Amino acid sequence: MPEGLNLRLLDVLGAAADALVDELDADACAISRVIGDVLILVTERVQAGSTLQSGQGYLVPDYPQTGEVLETRVPRTLTLDDPDVDAGEAAILRALGYGSLMMLPLEINESTWGLVEVYRMDRRPFTSADVARAVELCKIT
């Protein structure tokens, strides 16, 4: 991919992360590239002085709910109050200081390119309207 196209995509992804946080009353957003079974953070929108970067990628098989989103291409929301939240997903949320998460696939050219994660510090769940808006904001053409 030409360098100019890569920069344009990063600009588009950064703008999408900004819009998701602003429009969904969220506290943070991460957009990661999926390469095989690994998620690599490519852009984030967080509060000043913080990061979602862990220093390494995440292995998708370690997080079954994330894997399900990537495989089925169906968005998923969860909170730390959910009885069926995966222990690995819950541990990451707690470590990052968040209580609610929306995950959705990022599709480019009709294939799953990456994962979008939108976070809230509180445990207030994302609504179906939030999910619908996130899907619209993540359409990359």
Segments the model singles out, each with a brief description of its role:
Residues 18-22, 29-57, 61, 66, ...:
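GAF sensory/regulatory domain recognition
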Residues 34, 50-94, 102:
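Regulatory sensory and allosteric helical modules in signal-transduction proteins
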Residues 99-107:
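A short, aliphatic-rich beta-strand micro-motif
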Residues 103, 114-115:
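Short glycine-/small-residue motifs
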Residues 107-112, 121:
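Flexible loop/coil segments at beta-strand boundaries within sensory signal-transduction domains
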Residues 108, 126-141:
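Amphipathic alpha-helical "output/dimerization" segments
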Residues 115-125:
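Short beta-strand-to-loop transition segments that serve as allosteric relay/switch motifs
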